[in-house]
Amino acid sequence: MRGSTKECSISNIYKLDGRVPVSKAIPFGLQHILEMFVSNLAPITIIAGAAQPALSQEQIAMLLQNAMFVAGIATLIQLYPVWRIGSRLPIVMGVSFTFVTVLSTVAAGYGYPSVIGAVLVGGVFEGTLGLLAKYWRKIISPIVSATVVTAIGYSLFTVGTRSFGGGYADDFGSIQNLILGTVTLVTCLLWNIFAKGYLKQLSVLAGLTVGYILAIFLHKVDLSLIMSGGIISLPTLLPFKPEFHLGAIISVCIIFLVSSAETIGDTSAMVSGGLDREIEGREISGSLACDGYASSVSALFGCPPVTSFSQNVGLIAMTKVVNRFTIMTGAVCMILAGLLPPVGNFFASLPDAVLGGCTLMMFGTIMVSGVQMIAKCGFNQRNTTIAALSLAIGIGFTSASENAIWSVFPKVVQTVFAENVVAVVFVVSIILSLILPKDMDIKKVEEKNVDAE
């Protein structure tokens, strides 16, 4: 429900459109950006590292700066739509991990300019799909969305655990990282228990602050890097000339379909967990259109696709802070981080273990939101079959990837599905939703007593 009050009050953080004092809004917006900042940059370093010929450190630094700028702009469009592009919901956008595998393959085989060309085409493909959502929206039934949201929550557990242990650094699992993650997690929990009023919703920011300070004392933060790179630096448009290869484009477009499923799930979870209502068709259409066309814009700045960030969906579900102006302050901080290297360097210096301590609870919240959505759909025979079978196949088959269970399938199928539980759950749940009879409930047979003569 949209807030209608014009009064500027902190209580409006729980309303979509209420006015919030800037000084009160900034901490909540900043909390969102801190939560996703490193995850927004990591895919670029992985994809750029796989590129042949290799990208220079200067080029990678430029792409990281561009990614911050693009993520902020894309978030603003989700919050305040342009025409039919944008959902008008508090969705935070960032560079997607979903594309890392396929884009790393494209970068290694065709070169980084081919990544840009494939993302340009794929983004237009998803954006157009979003604008035409009213023609295919009914295929995505509520039980499909609910099951996908549950799968998204599950798929993020390993991401949170990886961050908790220190990310992809050589000291993964070290005692220092485990202490950092634990202290951050406990701080979030204690703040959530003992803080009063609206301050209770700043538990993640409190955890990040305490964890960051502890990381400084443990020498896990290099403060000298914060002022490196100058004071102001404008994003670079078209740093690479796009190249187009049919094989790369087809592979990336397939992953855009998977990303669409995740976006539908994220948007549904945000509306259900943050606004306590069912999602509307225009919101799905606008969200997907923004995902797609913003990804094409991202490619123009040399970056991979952007999409909704599940971490922030979990944060909204946990705090119920849905105010668009509040989230906008975070988007502005992201844009500033792309224009002011010291700001971006500060955010980028957040240790993975600190982020992991904050994300574990939020990722669990996403999964619980999915279960709640399934419960709202009802536990009849049909819904139970769709949810149970799609989750069993999705989790089971992707967990067994190392056992070569996917080896009989073509390479493109392995790339899309072998390690992507959300993609498998989405496809299986769609198929089951289309082919299963509408009424599968077991009917009781009433026996008529016949008097024996």
Regions found by a protein language model. Give the residues of each.
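N-terminal signal-anchor module of multipass membrane proteins
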Residues: 1-90, 98-106
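Juxtamembrane interface elements at the cytosolic ends of transmembrane helices
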Residues: 2-10, 40-44, 48, 184-194, ...
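Membrane-embedded alpha-helical modules
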Residues: 106-224, 331, 336-447
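Short, non-helical or kinked segments that cap or interrupt transmembrane helices
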Residues: 62, 84-98, 138-147, 199-205, ...
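Interfacial segments of multi-pass membrane proteins
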Residues: 104, 192, 312-327, 332-338
